[in-house]
């Protein structure tokens, strides 16, 4: 049996009593710790107009993390492609791959990573980005490909860098995109587990071998609490419970400390 590879996704949250600078320092501290204990990769999300998250400039955070680590793979989990021109994404990640060879991952999502009003501000007059996602993935593959596959517009220094692409998703739509291109598939089971089994099944059934992969490759995002005892794990998980409840009630509060009085605390989170 192959050894299970474990990685981490960081939304770069702000904890209660901290500011954005503290959150960025924590991001680096966590990356360095996970590198020491043998994690495979460390990905950073993309979120906009979120006062409790500092992950709006994902490419900059990926580069900053690469600069402060030595061996762990670092990437986006992911770049929300409808918000960005594929050419610029290729130039940015091609540059990082030049500076840090064989350490850069590029996870790609098709959601805006924010509310619709903010998405409109990001995209300006480009409102069909979600529907263009498959074509834009193809563009990125071309930009990272060999010189003889390029068109007039080239994403230097991305040409022939072959930065690994990962298709992210929380529904079955993304499974089709990944399968038809023979790309790795990453399912967001940490917030959308309902369609996880179906999406992975579709991906495996429709998978077409490519120069990248000869067989399907799946990564699953899960919420995991690690502790020495079940009691301690439940205590630590109370922070996540407070986050989830605040989100469902339209709040964007910093991550709260653990509590052994969870029911009482949750009752104070008003709509």
Task: List each model region and its residues.
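Aromatic/hydrophobic pocket-lining residues that form the small-molecule binding cavity
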Residues: 23-27, 58, 89, 133, ...
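N-terminal beta1-alpha1-beta2 module of alpha/beta enzyme domains
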Residues: 1-69, 270
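A conserved active-site cap/scaffold subdomain adjacent to cofactor or substrate pockets
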Residues: 179-187, 191
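Hydrophobic faces of well-ordered beta-strands that scaffold small-molecule active sites
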Residues: 6-8, 42-44, 74-76, 104-108, ...
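An alpha-helical appendage that flanks or caps ligand/catalytic pockets
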Residues: 2, 120, 126-154, 195-269
């Amino acid at each position: 049996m192959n050894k299970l590879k474990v990685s981490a996704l960081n939304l770069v949250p702000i904890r209660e009593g901290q500011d954005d600078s503290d959150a960025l320092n924590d991001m680096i501290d966590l990356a360095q710790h996970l590198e020491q204990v043998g994690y495979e990769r460390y990905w950073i999300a993309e979120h906009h107009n979120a006062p409790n998250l500092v992950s709006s400039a994902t490419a900059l955070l990926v580069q900053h993390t690469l600069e402060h680590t030595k061996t762990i793979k670092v990437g986006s989990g992911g770049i929300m492609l409808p918000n960005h021109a594929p050419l610029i994404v290729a130039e940015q990640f091609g540059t990082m791959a030049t500076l840090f060879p064989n350490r850069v991952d590029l996870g790609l999502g098709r959601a805006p990573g924010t509310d619709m009003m903010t998405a409109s501000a990001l995209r300006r007059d480009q409102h069909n980005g979600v529907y263009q996602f498959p074509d834009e993935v193809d563009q990125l593959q071309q930009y990272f490909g060999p010189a003889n596959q390029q068109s007039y517009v080239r994403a230097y220094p991305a040409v022939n860098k072959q930065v690994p692409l990962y298709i992210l998703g929380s529904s079955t739509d993304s499974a089709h995109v990944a399968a038809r291109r023979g790309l790795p598939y990453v399912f967001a089971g940490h917030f959308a587990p309902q369609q996880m089994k179906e999406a992975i099944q579709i991906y495996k059934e429709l998978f077409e071998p490519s120069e990248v992969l000869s067989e399907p490759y799946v990564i699953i995002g899960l919420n995991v609490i690690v502790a020495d005892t079940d009691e301690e794990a439940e205590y630590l998980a109370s922070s996540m419970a407070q986050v989830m409840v605040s989100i469902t009630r339209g709040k964007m509060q910093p991550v709260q400390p653990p509590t052994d009085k969870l029911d009482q605390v949750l009752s104070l989170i008003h709509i």
